[in-house]
């Protein structure tokens, strides 16, 4: 990351260009939600699959840094925009200063909470700019509320909530849960699906609860997607979220997700 005003200007340019794209092309709640979802995906990636890189970039010795989620599903840690007032609402300032003074998981959770607030502020900023009426604002909020928050994904709360939602309605299709294998070559390319309420019973295991959502982005499984399971934490991930293809998975004897790999390297 570049130092000084140049980095801040670059961040402002990136954020403002993204905002300009939405300004010119989007006029509906669905368009703003797509922008929200992409920025959220970038931030989730920073705090999960790219956490080692994110941790390094948040150097407490540097100036006030911010975490930006970008509309192309990437992220950037850089200085805040120099423009006053900024084109878009700004994320929390100085996230790097608390890094070494907190337990890592607590620090990541704090960044996640501030990121959730920023994502909402950007989405409803666009809503105000586009003159959304009550119904459009309600529709936008409903779509946003259908996704787990960044905080819920980072802390694992989203996986626990899945059990409640799955138990409240019956599934039309029952898919048995595949057995865990120690070798990734023999693992199925998709995660286990929620069982029918009558089959699963009132009590489910922690492992079953965590299998329904991607450990990186928090999204649920869709037919035809390639997923892979970590042999260490036994969480499931979209192949695209952890940059693993079916061909690459064939040659992996024991798969470790980015989170487990980064923990081992720092111990």
From Swiss-Prot:
<dbReference type="InterPro" id="IPR011011">
    <property type="entry name" value="Znf_FYVE_PHD"/>
</dbReference>
<dbReference type="GO" id="GO:0042393">
    <property type="term" value="F:histone binding"/>
</dbReference>
<dbReference type="GO" id="GO:0005634">
    <property type="term" value="C:nucleus"/>
</dbReference>
<keyword id="KW-0804">Transcription</keyword>
<feature type="site" description="Histone H3K4me3 binding">
    <location>
        <position position="227"/>
    </location>
</feature>
<feature type="region of interest" description="Disordered">
    <location>
        <begin position="162"/>
        <end position="207"/>
    </location>
</feature>
<protein>
    <recommendedName>
        <fullName>PHD finger protein ALFIN-LIKE 7</fullName>
    </recommendedName>
</protein>
<dbReference type="InterPro" id="IPR021998">
    <property type="entry name" value="Alfin_N"/>
</dbReference>
<dbReference type="GO" id="GO:0006355">
    <property type="term" value="P:regulation of DNA-templated transcription"/>
</dbReference>
<dbReference type="GO" id="GO:0003712">
    <property type="term" value="F:transcription coregulator activity"/>
</dbReference>
<dbReference type="GO" id="GO:0006325">
    <property type="term" value="P:chromatin organization"/>
</dbReference>
<dbReference type="GO" id="GO:0008270">
    <property type="term" value="F:zinc ion binding"/>
</dbReference>
<dbReference type="Pfam" id="PF12165">
    <property type="entry name" value="Alfin"/>
</dbReference>
<comment type="function">
    <text>Histone-binding component that specifically recognizes H3 tails trimethylated on 'Lys-4' (H3K4me3), which mark transcription start sites of virtually all active genes.</text>
</comment>
<keyword id="KW-0863">Zinc-finger</keyword>
<feature type="compositionally biased region" description="Low complexity">
    <location>
        <begin position="165"/>
        <end position="188"/>
    </location>
</feature>
<feature type="site" description="Histone H3K4me3 binding">
    <location>
        <position position="231"/>
    </location>
</feature>
<dbReference type="InterPro" id="IPR045104">
    <property type="entry name" value="Alfin"/>
</dbReference>
<keyword id="KW-0156">Chromatin regulator</keyword>
<feature type="zinc finger region" description="PHD-type">
    <location>
        <begin position="211"/>
        <end position="263"/>
    </location>
</feature>
<dbReference type="InterPro" id="IPR019786">
    <property type="entry name" value="Zinc_finger_PHD-type_CS"/>
</dbReference>
<feature type="site" description="Histone H3K4me3 binding">
    <location>
        <position position="236"/>
    </location>
</feature>
<dbReference type="InterPro" id="IPR001965">
    <property type="entry name" value="Znf_PHD"/>
</dbReference>
<keyword id="KW-0479">Metal-binding</keyword>
<feature type="site" description="Histone H3K4me3 binding">
    <location>
        <position position="221"/>
    </location>
</feature>
<keyword id="KW-0539">Nucleus</keyword>
<comment type="similarity">
    <text>Belongs to the Alfin family.</text>
</comment>
<dbReference type="GO" id="GO:0000976">
    <property type="term" value="F:transcription cis-regulatory region binding"/>
</dbReference>
<dbReference type="InterPro" id="IPR044104">
    <property type="entry name" value="PHD_AL_plant"/>
</dbReference>
<dbReference type="InterPro" id="IPR013083">
    <property type="entry name" value="Znf_RING/FYVE/PHD"/>
</dbReference>
<comment type="subunit">
    <text>Interacts with H3K4me3 and to a lesser extent with H3K4me2.</text>
</comment>
<keyword id="KW-0862">Zinc</keyword>
<dbReference type="Pfam" id="PF00628">
    <property type="entry name" value="PHD"/>
</dbReference>
<feature type="compositionally biased region" description="Acidic residues">
    <location>
        <begin position="196"/>
        <end position="207"/>
    </location>
</feature>
<keyword id="KW-0805">Transcription regulation</keyword>
<dbReference type="InterPro" id="IPR019787">
    <property type="entry name" value="Znf_PHD-finger"/>
</dbReference>
């Amino acid at each position: 990351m570049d130092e000084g005003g140049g980095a801040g200007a670059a961040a402002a340019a990136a954020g403002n260009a993204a905002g300009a794209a939405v300004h010119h092309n989007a006029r509906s709640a669905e368009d703003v939600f797509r922008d929200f979802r992409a920025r959220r995906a970038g931030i989730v990636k920073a705090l999960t699959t790219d956490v080692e890189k994110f941790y390094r970039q948040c150097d407490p010795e540097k100036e006030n840094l911010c975490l930006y989620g970008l509309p192309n599903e990437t992220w950037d840690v850089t200085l805040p925009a120099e423009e006053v007032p900024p084109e878009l609402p700004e994320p929390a300032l100085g996230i790097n200063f608390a890094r070494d003074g907190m337990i890592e998981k607590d620090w990541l959770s704090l960044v996640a909470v501030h990121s959730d607030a920023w994502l909402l502020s950007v989405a409803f900023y666009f809503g105000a700019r586009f003159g959304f009426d009550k119904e459009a604002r309600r529709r936008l909020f409903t779509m946003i509320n259908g996704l787990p928050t960044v905080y819920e994904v980072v802390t694992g709360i989203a996986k626990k909530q899945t059990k409640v939602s799955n138990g409240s309605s019956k599934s039309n299709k029952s898919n048995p849960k595949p057995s865990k294998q120690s070798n990734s070559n023999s693992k199925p390319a998709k995660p286990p699906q929620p069982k029918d309420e009558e089959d699963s019973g009132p009590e489910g295991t922690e492992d079953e609860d965590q299998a329904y959502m991607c450990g990186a982005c928090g999204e649920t499984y869709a037919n035809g997607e390639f997923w892979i399971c970590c042999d260490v934490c036994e969480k499931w991930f979209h192949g695209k979220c952890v940059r693993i293809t079916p061909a690459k998975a064939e040659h992996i004897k024991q798969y470790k997700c980015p989170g487990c790999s980064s923990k081992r390297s720092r111990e």
